[in-house]
């Protein structure tokens, strides 16, 4: 009898972890006016927002498993891509790079359209989830430019003693300007994932001129306010594990580029670093305090995080926006959803979409155990992009 109860408890525990009793439902959509021409046009062209998102049956309703699978695999399958690498030497000597992938067919609207993609933390054009989206967009007639965050490419040496940071828009800005010169007749759509979504949103809101080059922006799974999210991530066991994993990843990057990041000239420029503190850090807070704040000249973590957070710039954005979060994202808790929700409900041209499932950048769907190679988030990006392009074409 005891063994029976233990077996039942085990099965109930697995059932609870997998969240299998949760229903697959359509996303919640927050907008100002459902009867507006913009919203009606978008929803008519984007059935994905009105239909249930059905995660992979066995494990897809667990935000933690979605996030872990994304973190370990990126995507189930991803193509080998051939693109053109572009370099930009910045004023401090840093070499910013981005890769351009050309359309594999003509766009259905007949025009020239480019997705400008900013990946998540420590990611680049080689990241599996980026490659999956790029290939799908190419097949849909889009040119795709992907920013490589400083230090993220393993085979590219740094030429200046710095890596990326959460809120720097310099590299994205230079990619935009270079793309404008190379493809002056192309219409741009901004796409950002997680930290990259923070960067593109901040970039768009920093200066009104930045928005003139884009017909829309797409912010996917970002947290909006780093100061607000800090206590949430450090208060619970599993989020702390994710933070630890991200910290270890960045420490490996620092170690890989150690010779230039902590060279004599770097120490002369930024002051001496406490190497023991940096490489013994077990959280992003500790690492940022020991490294990022010192390199960037901030006196406190709050000052640094305040400067980085896109929520301070969001209200300046006036172009059409698609903003996405998942309720079960372990890195972006629902308490942060107030910022984009209030923004969307005050704008005529913004959709804030919140799914019940998806985790952090997971959004795997289809199948019982093995998901489809194409995720829900890939399909959502392309449907929204096509809808905005169609609206643009009608207005011309």
Regions found by a protein language model. Name each.
Residues 11-46, 181-296:
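Alpha/beta-hydrolase-fold enzymes
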Residues 59-110, 172, 370:
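N-terminal cap/lid segment of alpha/beta-hydrolase-fold proteins
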Residues 101-158, 174, 178-181, 334-337:
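Short, surface-exposed "cap/lid" segments of acyl-processing enzymes
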Residues 162-183, 202:
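Alpha/beta-hydrolase active-site loop
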Residues 290-313:
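Active-site nucleophile elbow and catalytic-triad environment of alpha/beta-hydrolase enzymes
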Residues 317, 323-325, 329:
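Short beta-strand/loop motif that positions the catalytic acidic residue
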Residues 333-350:
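Conserved loop-alpha-helix segment in the C-terminal half of the alpha/beta-hydrolase fold
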Residues 356-396:
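Catalytic active-site module of serine/aspartate enzymes centered on a nucleophile-bearing elbow/loop
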